[in-house]
Amino acid sequence: RDLRMSRGLGDVYKRQAKNNSVRKALDLTEEWEKATAAKGEKTSLAQGCLIVRTEFLEAHPNAVKAFLAEYKKSVDFVNGNTEKAAQMIADAGIVPNAQIAAKALPNCNIVYMTGDEMAKTAKANFDVLFKADPKSVGGAVPADDFYYTGK
């Protein structure tokens, strides 16, 4: 009944399937981009990330690169094959049926971002969280060596 209780975009579409008066009130990604553009440096709203321990990266750089390549293929597949991806999502039990997944996917903003663009986006997100409550990011914004940019 309350969209604030939704855990993800798929939940909005599940609720819409049951109650056609439920609607998407705003697009957080779009609002974030407007707010950051107004401050002179437009960035995306990062809602997920991949993390690797430095020790693992140093010991297995080729495995990390291979994983990232496969991850990019997955992102490209989901964005380029909505119907097939929707069926796979439903088959995995993430949402009750493929129709809900197909309706949700175009609004999920699933992206693959690496390098300096990723670091810039993550830093902007950390800065906002830090300004709101430094404890939310462990008391400090991560240093530049926190980000794996592939360099």
Model-derived regions: residue spans:
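Pocket-lining segment of extracytoplasmic ligand-binding domains
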Residues: 6-88
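Short secondary-structure capping/turn micro-motifs that flank functional sites
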Residues: 14, 95, 105, 145-146
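Generic secondary-structure boundary/loop-capping signal
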Residues: 29, 54, 102, 107-109, ...
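Solvent-exposed, flexible loop/coil residues
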Residues: 36, 109, 114-117, 141, ...
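Secondary-structure end/capping motifs
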Residues: 57-132
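Conserved C-terminal helix/tail region of periplasmic/extracytoplasmic solute-binding proteins
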Residues: 123-151
